[in-house]
Amino acid sequence: MRFWLALVLFVGGLTAGSIGVVNQVENTPIDTIIASQQLDQPTTYVMIPNKLLTAYSASPQITVRGGEIFIATARQSDLVSWLEGSPYVELRLSIDIARETAELAEVLVSGNGNLVAPEGSDLWITEVAGRSRVSLDIEPDNQTAILLASNGLELAPRSISIERDISDKPA
C-alpha cells in the first residue's frame, strides 16, 4: 500500500511540476519588440513620426537595408515642412495583440513637390548615410521624427526595421 501511495504522489508531483514549467514558459514577458516592413509603396521619402518612436518607453534602433541609404533625425514640424508638397510615405504602428505581432503600416501622403537631395540640410539634428545596411540608435523626445531616403531622386530603401529592447524597463 505504501508503494502505491508513493507512486501516486510521485506521478502527481511530476504532473504539477510540468504544468508549472509550461505555465511559466507561456507567460514569460516579451523582452524585445521588433516591427519591420518591406515597403510596398514606391516613394522617394519615408517619414517615421514621433508617435511611432515614442510608442514604448525603450529607445528604438532603426535599421534600414537596400542600396544607397540616408537617415536623418529632426523635429517633426521641421521635417513635415521640409517634405511639404513632396510625396512621401508615413509609417504607423499596427499591433495585433492576439498574435503578439507588431508591424509597420504605410500611409501614402501625395504631393507634386520637387525631389531634392536631403544631405546637408540645416534642419537635421543627426544624419547618417551609407550603403546596403545602416543602423541608428534614437533617443526619442517629444518632437523627434526620422526621414529615410536614398539620394532624393531614387526610391527610398525598401526594408525598414524598428527594434526596442524592453527587457530592463520597469513594468
Predicted regions and their residues:
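Extracytoplasmic/periplasmic regions of membrane proteins
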Residues: T28-E163
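Beta-strand elements of well-folded, non-transmembrane domains
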Residues: R164-D168
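Hydrophobic secretory-pathway targeting helix
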Residues: M1-P29, K169-A171
